[in-house]
Amino acid sequence: VHLSFENMSIYTKICGINDTKSGLLCSNLGADALGFIRYEKSPRFVELDVPLKIQENLDKELDIVFVFVNPSEKEVKTVIEKFPNSIIQFHGEEPAEFCESFGKKYIKAFHAYNLRYWKNYMDLYSSAHAFLIDSGNSVQKGGTGIAFDWKLIPKTEKEKIIVAGGINSSNVSDL
């Protein structure tokens, strides 16, 4: 599993891939990771056949990330069986023990409006390989396409932080 931030100024994960053509295009354009939503309430939910087809056609190594929101143990294990080198991203209220129980690198997501609890969060999920800060809100878990105030990003542990939400060609240099 790649997910290494060493010698890398920007790690690019394109999330919400739901068709083979888009996934391969993102790979060809230099993405470091592709994210697949495994939350059935999301309009970007994807069945496992799509990432399987993409993985079969990749001509380079990149991270495959599966995004879950409060999944069952069975849901996560099914993905791990089919994609043993994948990375799991937990985007709900999963307990740290649950996230750790699969013995894999994982990303723990939380919303920018909870940044005041950053230190507690890092302590609670100390086994997380990275933290994803998203601009989600109390209604929508993520995928809002809205940027948050990046000045709020904690100054410590920056190598473990992935920023999500509203990033585009006109504002990415502000990160």
Locations of regions flagged by a protein language model:
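Conserved N-terminal beta1-alpha1 strand-loop-helix module at the mouth
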Residues: 3-175
